[in-house]
Amino acid sequence: MYSSENDYSILEDKTATGKKRDWRGKKRRANLMAEHYEALEKRIGAPYYGKKAERLSECAEHLSFKRDPETGRLKLYQAHFCKVRLCPMCAWRRSLKIAYHNKLIIEEANRQYGCGWIFLTLTVRNVKGERLKPQISEMMEGFRKLFQYKKVKTSVLGFFRALEITKNHEEDTYHPHFHVLLPVKRNYFGKNYIKQAEWTSLWKRAMKLDYTPIVDIRRVKGRVKIDAEQIESDVREAMMEQKAVLEISKYPVKDTDVVRGSKVTDDNLNTVFYLDDALSARRLIGYGGILKEIHKELNLGDAEGGDLVKIEEEDDEVANGAFEVMAYWHPGIKNYILK
């Protein structure tokens, strides 16, 4: 649970498989992001950025856990998360929650419909920072149109859509794209099959593009039981349902892609400025068809704007026989210490 250094103890929180949860790394990255928002306030003069910097600095300052007396495992039960879109700490917690929700939804879809699964990636050309926000809006509208086309509606049972943005730092451009997990009828792979060229043509039409976009489509092979514990691991195995869940539930933007290095730089500030503008107050994930229905049936919360303390939905009995473990962020040591 902890390791001692001098007269204080350092927080150690591990998954059931023994992998260490990187609370320290996420908090340090959140504080670095706060420094960038502070610098943006000085550069632009807008209090908006200063307020976000303050929220980031206060994110996860204190963590309260319950420790299971039998296993020794910690379970977070109290914390304050800032929910700033670009916060590395909150992005990590959010991705765990989305992955866990998707695990439950996919298992239920398999049970109810016995469906097949395909993994679709929809892209457009890279854009400059000032074009990122309108480009994402156009993509959202294009996605809506795509799923209104008869060919798609008759072949696909629903969707889970996630937006991801990567940055080409050398060219100073941004690459927004959609990862989409699609449940399909079992006969989809026969007469209803939509080939890659057709998906490409439909996406081009929906987006009204004057070029041919890159579209990737692949079948999700295998129907394995998804292990919730693996959600916290960076699994890069064969393309199976579990891999698809992990792939599609990851962060919309990797924090290391936003802030490079450990110092405030002009390049980093520009990246934070454009990504903050493009992503604030925007839904980055979406469910449709049977997956939306199942999400509602299972009474799952809002993974984007909801509680980031409780990842798993079911109530467990750990709290009954557990005792409290409090961890506090120490700015000098730059780590969580136990009191």
Swiss-Prot record:
Coiled coil location: none
Top-level taxon of the source organism: Bacteria
InterPro entries: Rep (IPR000989)
Keyword rRNA-binding part of the UniProt annotation: no
Keywords: DNA replication, Plasmid
GO terms of biological process kind: DNA replication
Chain positions recorded as DNA binding sites: Y251
GO molecular function: DNA binding
Family: Belongs to the Gram-positive plasmids replication protein type 1 family.
Stated name of the protein: Protein rep
Organism: Bacillus amyloliquefaciens (Bacillus velezensis)
